[in-house]
Amino acid sequence: MIYLDNSATTNPKPQAVKNAVIRAMNYYSFNSGRGGYKESVNTSDMIFSCREKLSEMFGFPAENIAFTPNCTTAINFAIKGILKPGDHIIISYLEHNAVARPVYALFKNGIIDYDIADFSFDKEQTINNFKKLIKPNTKAIVCTHASNVFGCVFPIKEIGKLAHENGIIFIVDAAQSAGILDIDCKSDNIDILCAPGHKGLYAPMGIGFIALRDNVEIGTIIEGGTGSNSMKLAQPDNMPERLESGTLNNVGIIGLCAGIDFVAGKSVSSIYKHEKNLMKYIYGKLAKNNNVTLYTPSFNDAFLAPILSFNYKDYPSEKTASFLADKNIACRAGFHCSKLAHTAFGTDNRGTVRISPSVFTKYSECEKFINILKKL
């Protein structure tokens, strides 16, 4: 199979990640923070080492990183933990439903108000689109780093600066950028970062994280056992226990730890360079095919991540993807859990076909995809 659906989840996983998962099942299937025996302590140490690796990669304090089942849960923690009745929030027109639906639910229930900022391939215009929506009660700006549909990259550093100049919390959804684009909480002015493990960090499914800068106060939407302060009914104030109730996914965390090592060993910049070059090649070939409709300008790494949406002739996107699937090429068709993005780009009638490479994707596979598509 030629796998070009890495925006959904990277596949294959590195052998080191597979080995780590097996090792975790054999040696670290103990409840961390719940026992003083050696195996429990060793498990706790392994989990903290993963926090330290995330801290090194993204710049957040290790103790401010909490593990979640996925990025969607992390985003819900961020949005619902920050906003209070009467608050206003700004999101973008390229948000995944992981952002749009929690915000809309709070709005529908009369708790908050929100506005949506347009994306422009002119960086200054994008920043101004956010700026003009700021109100006295704006509490947060939530922004995807890279669109999961069209690959559009937001200028998060500048948007974060704008937020901080106005006393606004800046939350970044890094589902499509963690492990692919460089991210640093300080230089990028990020207050809260949410990301999955199973995409650009090459971890197993079922593990993600939320990371906070110091002095960011966040409420809870889940309370329970944390292994600490058990004789108090109130959820602990300190991180990461504040956002980690219940038994952790040790296997996923240790797999994530190995995934981070894999990415760090190759370097984020080299992974991005490989994927960018593949996407430039694919884009150039598709642009010469009169039957292909592309929705973004010629591939430019200043504003595009290695994600590409297209359509073929006037076919429904599912028909194109089904044809490719019959030829053993995996991609994603439809609306990609992103109503706002498809509405913004005018593809809400038939969706798009999305392709996305990984560090394991080969030029020969991309060439075969291009040649097979011509036969549709």
Model-derived regions: residue spans:
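Pyridoxal 5′-phosphate
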Residues: M1-L376
